[in-house]
Amino acid sequence: PQGLVTATKDAQHPTVLDLLRAEDRTPNTYPIGRLDRDTTGLLLLTDNGPLGFQLLHPQYHIEKEYEVTVNGPLEPAHIEEFQEGITFLDGTTCKPAKLKILNSSPKESQTLVTLSEGKFHQVKKMFLSVGVKVTSLKRIKFGDFSLDPDLTTGDYRPLNQDELQIIKNYLENN
C-alpha cells in the first residue's frame, strides 16, 4: 500500500513486512523488488534467496506490468519512443518497453507499461522524459504472476498450486 517502504526494516517508516502476521514471517523473508512509497500493487515476498535473485536479475528478463495514470496527453509517437528505449533526462537509456495507451485526454491519460528491467523510479522517469508526470502507479503483473483481484490493498496470500508450479518450472528452466 501507499506509504509503506518496500524493505525488511526502516527506522522512519512502516514496511511491507509490518503487514505480515507473526506466523507468516521468517527472519529471512524479504520483498522481491521494490515499489516506491507512493506505488501500489503486486509484490512478491520470499525467503528463498536464489529464487529472489533469479526473479530480479536483469539477465532473466522478467517482465513487470504497471497501470499508470499521467497528468497529460499521450500520443501514438510515445509508443514508438518506449519501444526504442526511453532516454532519461540524465542521459541514461532504458531497455525497450511496451506502452499501451488506454485513453488519453489533454489533462490525463491511462496506460499500461511493461518493462523487463527495474531502474530506480524508472516508470516515473520514463514518463517525465516524454513530458508528463505520473500521478498513479500500480504494479499488476510480475512475470507470470498477476495481482489477485480478490485481495484488497495491504492483503496478502500464499501462492496457490498453479503459482507454485510456475515457480518450479521457472527454477528448472533457469
PLM features: residue spans?
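Basic, flexible Lys/Arg- and Gly-enriched helix-loop patches that mediate nucleic-acid binding at interfaces
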Residues: 1-174
